[in-house]
Design a protein with these regions (language model features):
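Structural signature of hydrophobic alpha-helical transmembrane segments
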Residues: 42-52, 80-94, 186-195
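Generic multipass alpha-helical transmembrane bundles of integral membrane proteins
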Residues: 120-121, 129-240
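Juxtamembrane/interface segments at transmembrane-helix termini
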Residues: 162, 209-210, 240-244, 260-277
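Short, Lys/Arg-rich, polar N-terminal cytosolic tail immediately upstream
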Residues: 1-18
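Short, highly charged, low-complexity non-transmembrane loops/tails of multi-pass membrane proteins
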Residues: 268-300
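Alpha-helical membrane-embedded segments
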Residues: 143-151, 225-231, 247-267
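Membrane-interface helix-loop-helix junctions at boundaries between adjacent transmembrane segments
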Residues: 59, 72-145
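Hydrophobic transmembrane alpha-helices
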Residues: 20-74, 80-81
Length: 300
């Protein structure tokens, strides 16, 4: 186990020396994956669906804050929607407008969460985002997670329905707008997942804040289990047939990543914890002190 802590210390030391380069490298990779995923799912305008375009946009986004990546991703989706029909563009633009009203008001600094959520869905481990946010952030991160979830399901619907939305009269366009909005916001699976993510986030956040041994590990495992249970109950109640294999393995993968996050952000030695008591003129204080695990890296 000590070797893991040594590796952690070396990685943290390396990051502290090259943090600017590391942050930009991570941002670039995330941007490339985001633009590639958009083009792969809703790349209806062939000119912009090229990997070269995704690479160029990622390079541009790397020199700006993460929010610019979100804005460029939004613009790319809207252009692809325009190539399908005006109806697709109008509904998608309205959905983005609603999300940005809430997003910019509550979570303007959580752009990376909005980007990571659809990517996590594509990698079949969506619950890793709410679990990670609950460990490292506050429950308000659920707003950003919700925005990313809506974007994923919106793209998933358009990937299937785009061929039926092209062309048509003004009357037909109005019908397409209503159908598109209905299919997105009345998607039972979307609402089941959103509820599961909200409950999972609250459970993980509440448990990891408790003064109990191995709070983070318990929180991660509980969050993964809660996600499986809530989605399963929702599927049965709403008549949605989800892939339980993907759900279980995705939750296990998310739990593993959660434990890795604990190693880097909350490594403590519970065997050396102490309960302290002291007082001042007004209060008695009962404090539980748990020392951090710190190891010295061997010199080469």
């Amino acid at each position: 186990m000590d070797s893991l802590y040594v590796i952690r210390e070396r990685m943290q030391d390396l990051y502290s020396r090259y943090s600017i380069v590391a942050d930009k490298a991570i941002q670039f990779v995330l941007a490339v994956m985001t633009f590639y995923m958009i083009n792969n799912n809703v790349g209806f305008m062939k000119t912009l669906a090229s990997p070269v375009v995704a690479l160029a946009l990622a390079i541009i986004a790397t020199f700006f804050p993460p929010i610019i990546t979100v804005i460029l991703a939004t613009a790319l989706i809207l252009v692809h929607m325009y190539s399908v029909s005006i109806a697709a563009l109008v509904v998608t633009a309205l959905i983005f407008l609603i999300m940005y009203i809430f997003y910019l008001r509550f979570t303007p600094k959580m752009a990376i969460v909005v980007l990571l959520t659809p990517l996590a869905f594509a990698l079949k481990i969506p619950v890793v985002v709410p679990i990670s946010c609950a460990l490292l952030m506050s429950p308000i991160s659920m707003v950003a997670v919700g925005c990313g979830t809506v974007v994923y399901y919106m793209m998933a619907y358009m990937k299937k329905a785009a061929s039926g939305m092209q062309g048509g009269s003004v009357k037909g366009m109005m019908g397409q707008i209503g159908k598109y909005a209905k299919q997105v916001f009345q998607n039972k699976e979307l609402w089941i997942v959103l509820v599961a993510f909200i409950i999972c986030t609250l459970v993980v956040y509440t448990l990891r804040k408790q003064a109990i041994a191995h709070a983070w590990t318990i929180a991660v495992i509980a969050g993964a289990v809660v996600n499986i249970v809530v989605v399963a109950i929702g599927d049965v109640a709403m008549g949605v047939h989800a892939s339980y294999g993907s759900l279980i393995f995705g939750s296990i993968g998310a739990a593993v990543i959660g434990v890795i996050l604990e190693l880097f952000f909350f490594s403590v030695d519970y065997s050396r914890s102490e309960n302290l008591q002291y007082e001042d003129d007004e209060y008695y204080y009962y404090v539980k002190a748990v020392p951090k695990i710190v190891v010295s890296t061997p010199e080469k």
